[in-house]
Amino acid sequence: MKLKKIIACAAAFAMTATCFAGCGSTSDSAADTSAETSAAAENDSAADTSEETSGEETSDSTDGEADPETRTIVDHTGAEVTLPANIDRVVISSILPLPSVYCLFRGSADDIIGIHPSSMAAAENSYLINVFPEIANADTSFVENGAVNIEQLLSMEPDVVFYSAANTEERDLYDNAGIPAVGFSTTMAGYDCIETYADWIELLGDIYGDSESADKIIEFGRNTASEIKAVTDNIADEDKPKVLILFNYANGVITAGGSDFFSKYWIETAGGINVAADLSGSAEINMEQVYEWDPDIILITNFSPYLPEDLYNNTIEGHDWSTVSAVNNGKVYKFPLGMYRWFPPCSDTPLVLKWLAKTIQPEKFADIDMDSEIKSYYKEFYGVELTDDDVQNIYTPA
Protein backbone atom coordinates (compact mmCIF):
# COMPACT_ATOMS: atom_id res chain seq x y z
CA MET A 1 0.00 0.00 0.00
CA LYS A 2 1.51 3.27 -1.09
CA LEU A 3 0.87 6.63 0.50
CA LYS A 4 0.17 9.53 -1.82
CA LYS A 5 2.30 12.40 -0.56
CA ILE A 6 0.74 15.83 -0.34
CA ILE A 7 2.96 18.54 -1.80
CA ALA A 8 2.57 21.19 0.87
CA CYS A 9 3.80 24.76 0.81
CA ALA A 10 5.35 24.34 4.22
CA ALA A 11 8.80 22.85 4.08
CA ALA A 12 8.00 21.08 7.33
CA PHE A 13 6.02 18.52 5.39
CA ALA A 14 8.64 17.94 2.68
CA MET A 15 9.28 14.28 3.46
CA THR A 16 9.03 11.08 1.46
CA ALA A 17 6.05 8.79 2.01
CA THR A 18 6.75 5.08 2.10
CA CYS A 19 4.82 1.84 2.15
CA PHE A 20 2.48 1.33 5.06
CA ALA A 21 3.89 -1.31 7.40
CA GLY A 22 1.99 -3.52 9.84
CA CYS A 23 1.58 -1.51 13.02
CA GLY A 24 0.47 -3.94 15.66
CA SER A 25 3.48 -5.72 17.12
CA THR A 26 3.45 -5.70 20.89
CA SER A 27 6.54 -7.79 21.52
CA ASP A 28 8.32 -4.85 23.11
CA SER A 29 5.32 -3.55 25.02
CA ALA A 30 6.32 -4.90 28.42
CA ALA A 31 9.41 -2.72 28.52
CA ASP A 32 7.44 0.21 27.19
CA THR A 33 4.70 -0.31 29.78
CA SER A 34 7.23 -0.19 32.59
CA ALA A 35 8.72 3.03 31.29
CA GLU A 36 5.27 4.58 30.73
CA THR A 37 4.10 3.82 34.26
CA SER A 38 7.38 5.02 35.71
CA ALA A 39 7.02 8.31 33.88
CA ALA A 40 3.47 8.61 35.18
CA ALA A 41 4.67 8.65 38.78
CA GLU A 42 6.22 12.13 38.74
CA ASN A 43 6.64 14.34 41.77
CA ASP A 44 3.64 16.67 41.93
CA SER A 45 5.57 19.47 43.59
CA ALA A 46 7.90 19.73 40.61
CA ALA A 47 4.88 19.83 38.35
CA ASP A 48 3.33 22.62 40.40
CA THR A 49 6.52 24.64 40.15
CA SER A 50 6.75 24.18 36.42
CA GLU A 51 3.12 25.07 35.85
CA GLU A 52 3.83 28.54 37.19
CA THR A 53 7.09 29.07 35.32
CA SER A 54 7.07 26.92 32.16
CA GLY A 55 7.20 28.86 28.93
CA GLU A 56 8.98 31.90 30.34
CA GLU A 57 11.88 32.82 28.09
CA THR A 58 14.88 34.66 29.49
CA SER A 59 18.12 35.98 28.04
CA ASP A 60 21.48 34.32 28.63
CA SER A 61 23.52 37.42 29.34
CA THR A 62 25.14 38.91 32.40
CA ASP A 63 24.91 42.49 31.12
CA GLY A 64 21.24 42.43 30.19
CA GLU A 65 21.84 41.89 26.48
CA ALA A 66 20.46 38.75 24.87
CA ASP A 67 23.01 36.28 23.54
CA PRO A 68 22.01 35.62 19.91
CA GLU A 69 23.67 32.20 20.02
CA THR A 70 21.62 30.80 22.91
CA ARG A 71 18.06 30.58 24.16
CA THR A 72 17.05 30.05 27.79
CA ILE A 73 13.78 28.27 28.51
CA VAL A 74 12.06 26.90 31.61
CA ASP A 75 11.24 23.20 31.44
CA HIS A 76 8.56 21.20 33.24
CA THR A 77 10.72 20.69 36.33
CA GLY A 78 10.95 24.47 36.76
CA ALA A 79 14.63 24.46 35.75
CA GLU A 80 16.12 27.14 33.50
CA VAL A 81 17.91 25.48 30.60
CA THR A 82 20.23 27.34 28.23
CA LEU A 83 20.17 25.90 24.73
CA PRO A 84 21.89 26.68 21.44
CA ALA A 85 19.80 29.04 19.32
CA ASN A 86 20.18 26.55 16.47
CA ILE A 87 19.53 22.98 17.56
CA ASP A 88 20.68 20.34 15.09
CA ARG A 89 21.34 17.25 17.21
CA VAL A 90 18.48 16.03 19.42
CA VAL A 91 18.34 12.96 21.66
CA ILE A 92 14.96 11.89 23.06
CA SER A 93 15.43 9.62 26.05
CA SER A 94 12.92 8.47 28.67
CA ILE A 95 9.82 10.35 27.48
CA LEU A 96 8.80 7.52 25.18
CA PRO A 97 5.89 8.98 23.15
CA LEU A 98 7.74 12.26 22.47
CA PRO A 99 9.33 11.29 19.12
CA SER A 100 5.87 11.28 17.53
CA VAL A 101 5.03 14.68 19.04
CA TYR A 102 8.41 16.07 18.00
CA CYS A 103 7.83 14.92 14.40
CA LEU A 104 4.35 16.45 14.43
CA PHE A 105 5.75 19.78 15.60
CA ARG A 106 8.90 19.88 13.46
CA GLY A 107 7.56 18.06 10.41
CA SER A 108 10.72 15.97 10.27
CA ALA A 109 12.94 13.65 12.28
CA ASP A 110 16.13 14.84 10.56
CA ASP A 111 17.53 16.43 13.73
CA ILE A 112 16.88 13.38 15.92
CA ILE A 113 20.19 11.56 16.39
CA GLY A 114 19.10 9.27 19.22
CA ILE A 115 15.97 7.83 20.83
CA HIS A 116 15.25 5.33 23.59
CA PRO A 117 15.20 1.69 22.37
CA SER A 118 11.57 1.37 23.47
CA SER A 119 10.66 4.43 21.40
CA MET A 120 12.42 2.86 18.42
CA ALA A 121 10.51 -0.40 18.90
CA ALA A 122 7.27 1.57 18.99
CA ALA A 123 8.26 3.54 15.87
CA GLU A 124 9.09 0.39 13.94
CA ASN A 125 5.67 -1.08 14.74
CA SER A 126 3.65 2.08 14.15
CA TYR A 127 2.93 4.52 11.38
CA LEU A 128 5.71 6.90 12.50
CA ILE A 129 8.55 5.23 10.63
CA ASN A 130 6.57 5.27 7.38
CA VAL A 131 5.90 8.99 7.40
CA PHE A 132 9.24 9.92 8.97
CA PRO A 133 11.59 7.18 7.71
CA GLU A 134 14.65 9.16 8.77
CA ILE A 135 13.91 8.27 12.39
CA ALA A 136 15.24 4.79 11.63
CA ASN A 137 18.72 6.35 11.57
CA ALA A 138 18.50 7.40 15.23
CA ASP A 139 21.02 5.75 17.57
CA THR A 140 19.65 3.76 20.51
CA SER A 141 22.97 2.56 21.93
CA PHE A 142 23.11 5.25 24.64
CA VAL A 143 20.54 3.27 26.66
CA GLU A 144 21.73 -0.09 28.00
CA ASN A 145 19.43 -2.30 30.09
CA GLY A 146 17.13 0.66 30.63
CA ALA A 147 19.88 2.99 31.89
CA VAL A 148 21.64 5.86 30.13
CA ASN A 149 25.30 5.23 29.26
CA ILE A 150 26.59 8.76 29.67
CA GLU A 151 29.91 8.08 27.92
CA GLN A 152 28.11 6.77 24.84
CA LEU A 153 25.74 9.72 24.93
CA LEU A 154 28.62 12.21 25.12
CA SER A 155 30.21 10.57 22.09
CA MET A 156 27.05 11.39 20.12
CA GLU A 157 27.58 15.12 20.80
CA PRO A 158 23.91 16.09 21.31
CA ASP A 159 22.85 19.73 21.43
CA VAL A 160 20.06 18.77 23.84
CA VAL A 161 18.45 15.76 25.48
CA PHE A 162 14.70 15.53 26.11
CA TYR A 163 13.77 13.26 29.03
CA SER A 164 10.91 12.46 31.42
CA ALA A 165 10.74 15.08 34.16
CA ALA A 166 10.10 12.26 36.64
CA ASN A 167 13.63 10.94 36.26
CA THR A 168 15.66 13.18 38.56
CA GLU A 169 18.63 10.80 38.60
CA GLU A 170 18.76 10.94 34.82
CA ARG A 171 18.74 14.74 34.99
CA ASP A 172 21.69 14.64 37.40
CA LEU A 173 23.64 12.59 34.85
CA TYR A 174 23.09 15.19 32.17
CA ASP A 175 23.87 18.13 34.44
CA ASN A 176 27.09 16.53 35.66
CA ALA A 177 28.13 15.82 32.07
CA GLY A 178 27.33 19.36 30.93
CA ILE A 179 24.63 18.26 28.48
CA PRO A 180 21.62 20.62 28.17
CA ALA A 181 18.55 18.61 29.21
CA VAL A 182 14.86 19.52 29.04
CA GLY A 183 12.33 17.68 31.22
CA PHE A 184 8.88 16.92 29.79
CA SER A 185 6.16 16.13 32.33
CA THR A 186 3.43 13.51 32.07
CA THR A 187 1.56 14.66 35.19
CA MET A 188 1.55 18.45 35.47
CA ALA A 189 -1.81 18.54 33.67
CA GLY A 190 -3.33 16.01 36.08
CA TYR A 191 -3.35 13.21 33.47
CA ASP A 192 -5.47 15.33 31.13
CA CYS A 193 -4.21 13.85 27.86
CA ILE A 194 -5.11 16.83 25.67
CA GLU A 195 -3.43 19.28 28.05
CA THR A 196 -0.37 17.04 28.45
CA TYR A 197 -0.05 16.94 24.66
CA ALA A 198 -0.51 20.74 24.64
CA ASP A 199 2.17 21.19 27.34
CA TRP A 200 4.66 19.18 25.29
CA ILE A 201 3.91 21.16 22.14
CA GLU A 202 4.13 24.47 24.01
CA LEU A 203 7.52 23.52 25.44
CA LEU A 204 8.77 22.56 21.97
CA GLY A 205 7.53 25.96 20.78
CA ASP A 206 9.62 27.62 23.51
CA ILE A 207 12.67 25.52 22.64
CA TYR A 208 12.51 26.39 18.95
CA GLY A 209 11.06 29.89 19.25
CA ASP A 210 8.04 28.89 17.18
CA SER A 211 4.90 29.69 19.12
CA GLU A 212 2.87 30.08 15.92
CA SER A 213 3.22 26.41 14.96
CA ALA A 214 2.67 25.37 18.56
CA ASP A 215 -0.49 27.44 18.91
CA LYS A 216 -2.05 25.90 15.79
CA ILE A 217 -1.56 22.35 17.06
CA ILE A 218 -2.65 23.19 20.60
CA GLU A 219 -5.78 24.97 19.39
CA PHE A 220 -6.90 21.95 17.40
CA GLY A 221 -6.52 19.66 20.41
CA ARG A 222 -8.31 21.98 22.80
CA ASN A 223 -11.13 22.60 20.33
CA THR A 224 -11.56 18.84 20.01
CA ALA A 225 -11.78 18.45 23.79
CA SER A 226 -14.27 21.32 24.06
CA GLU A 227 -16.51 19.81 21.38
CA ILE A 228 -16.54 16.40 23.06
CA LYS A 229 -17.05 17.78 26.57
CA ALA A 230 -19.91 20.01 25.40
CA VAL A 231 -21.80 16.77 24.80
CA THR A 232 -20.53 14.43 27.52
CA ASP A 233 -20.80 16.97 30.34
CA ASN A 234 -24.57 16.86 29.82
CA ILE A 235 -24.97 13.09 29.89
CA ALA A 236 -26.58 11.74 33.07
CA ASP A 237 -24.62 9.11 34.97
CA GLU A 238 -27.34 6.53 34.38
CA ASP A 239 -26.77 6.95 30.64
CA LYS A 240 -23.03 6.38 30.86
CA PRO A 241 -21.68 2.85 30.29
CA LYS A 242 -19.29 1.22 32.73
CA VAL A 243 -15.88 1.03 31.08
CA LEU A 244 -12.78 -1.02 31.92
CA ILE A 245 -9.41 -0.26 30.34
CA LEU A 246 -7.08 -3.24 30.31
CA PHE A 247 -3.87 -1.24 30.39
CA ASN A 248 -1.63 -4.29 30.32
CA TYR A 249 -2.82 -7.86 30.08
CA ALA A 250 -0.28 -10.62 29.46
CA ASN A 251 1.12 -13.80 31.00
CA GLY A 252 -1.88 -14.24 33.26
CA VAL A 253 -1.58 -10.78 34.82
CA ILE A 254 -4.34 -8.19 34.34
CA THR A 255 -3.53 -4.53 34.95
CA ALA A 256 -6.38 -2.02 34.90
CA GLY A 257 -6.22 1.75 34.50
CA GLY A 258 -7.60 3.51 37.55
CA SER A 259 -7.57 7.11 38.75
CA ASP A 260 -4.42 9.25 38.77
CA PHE A 261 -3.76 7.86 35.32
CA PHE A 262 -4.63 8.62 31.70
CA SER A 263 -7.52 6.14 31.79
CA LYS A 264 -9.52 8.44 34.07
CA TYR A 265 -9.36 11.29 31.57
CA TRP A 266 -10.12 9.16 28.55
CA ILE A 267 -13.14 7.38 29.98
CA GLU A 268 -14.76 10.29 31.79
CA THR A 269 -14.21 12.85 29.02
CA ALA A 270 -15.60 10.44 26.42
CA GLY A 271 -18.79 9.87 28.41
CA GLY A 272 -18.19 6.70 30.42
CA ILE A 273 -17.77 5.61 34.03
CA ASN A 274 -14.40 4.14 34.96
CA VAL A 275 -15.14 0.95 36.89
CA ALA A 276 -11.58 1.01 38.25
CA ALA A 277 -11.86 4.56 39.60
CA ASP A 278 -11.18 3.42 43.16
CA LEU A 279 -7.76 2.10 42.11
CA SER A 280 -4.75 4.39 41.95
CA GLY A 281 -2.69 4.52 38.78
CA SER A 282 -2.38 1.20 36.99
CA ALA A 283 -3.15 -1.67 39.33
CA GLU A 284 -3.22 -5.46 39.11
CA ILE A 285 -6.70 -6.97 39.33
CA ASN A 286 -8.21 -10.47 39.14
CA MET A 287 -11.22 -11.94 37.37
CA GLU A 288 -13.33 -11.82 40.52
CA GLN A 289 -12.97 -8.05 40.45
CA VAL A 290 -13.93 -7.99 36.78
CA TYR A 291 -17.04 -10.06 37.54
CA GLU A 292 -17.99 -7.66 40.34
CA TRP A 293 -17.61 -4.63 38.09
CA ASP A 294 -19.21 -6.36 35.05
CA PRO A 295 -18.18 -3.61 32.60
CA ASP A 296 -20.38 -2.70 29.65
CA ILE A 297 -17.32 -1.85 27.53
CA ILE A 298 -13.75 -3.18 27.65
CA LEU A 299 -10.87 -1.34 25.99
CA ILE A 300 -7.54 -3.12 25.45
CA THR A 301 -4.44 -0.98 24.98
CA ASN A 302 -1.54 -1.81 22.67
CA PHE A 303 0.60 -2.64 25.68
CA SER A 304 -1.23 -5.98 25.67
CA PRO A 305 -0.89 -8.64 22.96
CA TYR A 306 -4.53 -9.68 23.27
CA LEU A 307 -7.28 -8.81 20.82
CA PRO A 308 -11.06 -8.65 21.36
CA GLU A 309 -11.37 -12.07 19.71
CA ASP A 310 -9.32 -13.61 22.51
CA LEU A 311 -12.00 -12.54 24.99
CA TYR A 312 -14.93 -13.36 22.69
CA ASN A 313 -13.57 -16.86 22.03
CA ASN A 314 -12.56 -17.28 25.68
CA THR A 315 -9.14 -18.63 24.71
CA ILE A 316 -7.02 -17.01 27.44
CA GLU A 317 -5.90 -19.79 29.75
CA GLY A 318 -7.04 -19.45 33.35
CA HIS A 319 -9.43 -16.55 32.70
CA ASP A 320 -13.10 -17.07 31.90
CA TRP A 321 -14.57 -13.99 30.19
CA SER A 322 -17.77 -15.67 29.02
CA THR A 323 -20.07 -14.12 31.63
CA VAL A 324 -18.88 -10.50 31.33
CA SER A 325 -21.45 -8.15 29.77
CA ALA A 326 -18.98 -6.39 27.45
CA VAL A 327 -17.94 -9.75 26.01
CA ASN A 328 -21.49 -11.06 25.61
CA ASN A 329 -22.62 -7.86 23.92
CA GLY A 330 -19.67 -7.57 21.53
CA LYS A 331 -18.28 -4.42 23.10
CA VAL A 332 -14.60 -5.25 23.51
CA TYR A 333 -12.32 -2.93 21.56
CA LYS A 334 -8.61 -2.67 20.86
CA PHE A 335 -7.12 0.83 20.91
CA PRO A 336 -5.99 1.81 17.41
CA LEU A 337 -2.32 2.34 16.69
CA GLY A 338 -1.28 5.31 14.56
CA MET A 339 1.87 7.36 15.04
CA TYR A 340 2.15 5.83 18.52
CA ARG A 341 0.02 3.69 20.80
CA TRP A 342 -3.33 5.40 21.34
CA PHE A 343 -3.32 5.45 25.14
CA PRO A 344 -0.58 7.74 26.49
CA PRO A 345 -0.47 11.28 25.08
CA CYS A 346 1.06 11.25 21.61
CA SER A 347 0.85 13.14 18.33
CA ASP A 348 -2.55 11.54 17.54
CA THR A 349 -4.14 12.51 20.87
CA PRO A 350 -7.09 14.53 19.46
CA LEU A 351 -8.02 11.54 17.29
CA VAL A 352 -7.90 9.24 20.32
CA LEU A 353 -10.50 11.35 22.11
CA LYS A 354 -12.81 11.37 19.09
CA TRP A 355 -12.48 7.60 18.67
CA LEU A 356 -13.23 7.00 22.33
CA ALA A 357 -16.25 9.30 22.30
CA LYS A 358 -17.58 7.50 19.23
CA THR A 359 -16.92 4.12 20.87
CA ILE A 360 -18.31 4.88 24.33
CA GLN A 361 -21.26 7.07 23.27
CA PRO A 362 -22.01 6.03 19.66
CA GLU A 363 -25.48 7.56 19.57
CA LYS A 364 -24.32 10.91 20.94
CA PHE A 365 -21.47 11.06 18.42
CA ALA A 366 -23.15 9.52 15.40
CA ASP A 367 -22.01 12.52 13.36
CA ILE A 368 -18.31 11.70 13.83
CA ASP A 369 -16.94 9.91 10.77
CA MET A 370 -13.68 8.50 12.12
CA ASP A 371 -12.37 7.49 8.71
CA SER A 372 -12.70 11.09 7.52
CA GLU A 373 -11.36 12.48 10.79
CA ILE A 374 -8.20 10.37 10.59
CA LYS A 375 -7.61 11.15 6.92
CA SER A 376 -8.14 14.88 7.47
CA TYR A 377 -5.83 15.03 10.51
CA TYR A 378 -3.04 13.11 8.81
CA LYS A 379 -3.31 15.29 5.73
CA GLU A 380 -3.25 18.57 7.66
CA PHE A 381 -0.68 17.75 10.33
CA TYR A 382 1.56 15.13 8.70
CA GLY A 383 1.13 15.98 5.03
CA VAL A 384 0.06 12.51 3.90
CA GLU A 385 -3.07 11.12 2.28
CA LEU A 386 -4.25 7.84 3.72
CA THR A 387 -6.07 5.18 1.74
CA ASP A 388 -9.04 3.28 3.15
CA ASP A 389 -6.73 0.33 3.76
CA ASP A 390 -4.30 2.54 5.67
CA VAL A 391 -7.08 3.67 7.99
CA GLN A 392 -8.23 0.09 8.55
CA ASN A 393 -4.69 -0.89 9.51
CA ILE A 394 -4.67 1.88 12.13
CA TYR A 395 -7.93 0.52 13.56
CA THR A 396 -6.84 -3.11 13.65
CA PRO A 397 -3.27 -3.54 14.91
CA ALA A 398 -2.44 -7.24 14.88
PLM features per residue range, with description:
Residues 18-22:
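C-terminal motif of bacterial Sec signal peptides marking the signal peptidase cleavage site
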Residues 89-93, 111-116, 160-164, 181-185, ...:
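Structural recognition of the beta-strand scaffold that forms the well-ordered cores
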Residues 255-281:
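Alpha-helical, coiled-coil/dimerization segments enriched in small aliphatic residues
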Residues 94-152, 160:
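A short, structured surface patch at a secondary-structure boundary
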Residues 6, 24-101, 212-246, 366-398:
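Bacterial Sec-exported substrate-binding components of ABC uptake systems
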